[in-house]
């Protein structure tokens, strides 16, 4: 599945949105939006007054009252349609996800062995902890962890990426997702979720927004809008007795009608942002999905907009991530070939790019052929985040390679001595931005393998943009401080954490949060889970482990760590859109005030005609023009609410100034022009 962004006013979406907008006229739906609920009540009230005029139960202009009632209903419908369009785009995305989810069968195993007895069962009957065998051509029946085997898996149904990926037991690529398909070989998988709780089920629920809760900022803004609505409601309510008293005192004009007061109230309360607020939130999650990122809630998207510290893994995010062995640097008393032989032996079972490159370099330099570890009766020691080294035990030899501090501890624990000359070699490699990998055999240090990595093109400029926005970037790496400092300087990050362990990451996040900062990070391994759970915005890689995906509040389907920067941009754009439209909505009130107040009270107080600076044709056309503009502006702003305002990297103060000029001044001027044009049209049509 590819998450292609659909056109905002695509005919099928518009038709569905129109039907949904009418369905949302149900009062049980309307009361959830307090601002628009006031407009909804005003629509019913003016409609009843219009019917009373038609039936002769009261006096007044049926044409004027009916027109006001009609446009108030349009205001409610347009607000409903904005939300329905946003939800419609999400529902279309959910429908394509449902197409991926289909009934399949599973080979349930009694034990975690490929040759264990198996039973054919429906995938829907599988429970957490069940074991299944998945062979070439089979659909993965559940989300789970690979316990045995390795296979090529087609994940295009979930990620949109056509290239197959390798899933195998152990390491950070042991997670499989229900709905994907095994292309070759076999896997023994333990199911980690029950039916209805799979990643695909959660994706569908998230993008549908069926259980969308308001975010903290959305709640705060709603409280502000409700407060403004109450203030304007009280102010409008006092105008009726004031009008009656004024008419009696001056013996001129007539009291303001309920219809005019309702029109005034609707034009003064912040209906523009009130009608678009929900659509902005839904569209934010939809834009995140368009970037192939699944957010667990709008709360996560909003938090991304408030982030001011990014923790970025060096490998794959800042550098290309394909570090290659470039040189063997032997310790005193050791030949380069001896070092190459030991380094190659320790890397024969190492499937990392670094390990494979060491094997290749040893072949190229000294014609050292690969050896079969099984025939040598060798035991491979895999790398772990805790030991920060790997190696091999072969016959009487105990070879280890890893970070300088890890090898130092290993050598000293074996009563060995770490030569100062090797420290010099390590510093020399690190100063040039390379990564020194120290090799030792038993208690003897053999030397250093220099690994070279390349900083991604354009990454320095992206970090400069983030700095303009007030976001601090911190590089996380397992390299020593010298290497980390060299790469950090080249990439242009603000700070770095060298020789990082899972505990150090967690401590750093807590330190920043204690300072009142919001932290974002990415991760893919089980060892990243505690830090992901602690971070305010935690983007787990889809290729990572189940534990990492459960700990994060977002999942990147492309498994691209650099995506974190784009996630922050989308979050900030959503917050900016909400703020910009709020500014525009409140600024709108000024022009409507100049339109309606003179029209309502000039007959009693002729001096108020001085406020009719737009020279509107008549009181009725002035009021109707303001109400029509109030409804139409929602329609014109729907594309902006769904797409988001244009985003540029700059400081918060500069952004505020820019948006005040565009949306504050625009909100003041546009209604003057719009209301005057509508008044001219109504006059030309003899409706004023």
UniProtKB/Swiss-Prot annotation:
It catalyses: K(+)(out) + ATP + H2O = K(+)(in) + ADP + phosphate + H(+). This is Potassium-transporting ATPase ATP-binding subunit. It holds the Pfam family Hydrolase. Its EC number is 7.2.2.6. Keywords: ATP-binding, Cell inner membrane, Cell membrane, Ion transport, Magnesium, Membrane, Metal-binding, Nucleotide-binding, Phosphoprotein, Potassium, Potassium transport, Translocase, Transmembrane, Transmembrane helix, Transport. Part of the high-affinity ATP-driven potassium transport (or Kdp) system, which catalyzes the hydrolysis of ATP coupled with the electrogenic transport of potassium into the cytoplasm. This subunit is responsible for energy coupling to the transport system and for the release of the potassium ions to the cytoplasm. Belongs to the cation transport ATPase (P-type) (TC 3.A.3) family. Type IA subfamily. ATP binds at residues 350, 354, 383-390, 401. The chain crosses the membrane at residues 34-54, 62-82, 219-239, 260-280, 594-614, 622-642, 662-682. The system is composed of three essential subunits: KdpA, KdpB and KdpC.
